[in-house]
Amino acid sequence: MQSTMKMFGIILMVIFSVSCGPSAPQMKTREVAERTHKCSLVRGTCKSECNSWEYKYNYCHTEPCCVVREYKRMEKLLSTPKYTT
C-alpha cells in the first residue's frame, strides 16, 4: 500500500512539474510574435534583406526588420538669419 502511494506521489510530482509554465516552442513563438509586432509599430517590414534606403531595426525571427530612413530637412541651413545691407 505504501509503495503504491509513493509511486502515485512521484507520478503526480512529475505531471505537475512538467505541466507548469509554457513550453519552449510556445515561448519562442511568443517572442517572434512580439518582435514582429514591434517591427510593425515602427512601420517596418520583415524581409530577407534590407535595401540601401532602409536600416535594420531588430530581427523578427531570422530575417531583419527593415525600416525606411526618413528624409529630414536640414533646419540649420533653413533657419539662418539673412543679413541685408
UniProtKB/Swiss-Prot annotation:
Domain of life: Eukaryota
UniProt KW RNA-binding keyword: no
Biological processes, Gene Ontology terms: defense response to bacterium; innate immune response
GO cellular component terms listed in the entry, alphabetical order: extracellular region
Cell location: Secreted
The keyword Secreted is assigned to this record: yes
Signal peptide: 1-23
Pfam family, one: Defensin_beta_2
The entry's keywords: Antibiotic, Antimicrobial, Defensin, Disulfide bond, Secreted, Signal
Disulphide-bonded residues: C39-C65, C46-C60, C50-C66
Cross-referenced InterPro entries: Beta_defensin_dom (IPR025933)
Function, in words: Has antibacterial activity.
PANTHER family tied to this protein: BETA-DEFENSIN 113
Similarity section: Belongs to the beta-defensin family.
Protein name: Beta-defensin 18
Organism: Mus musculus
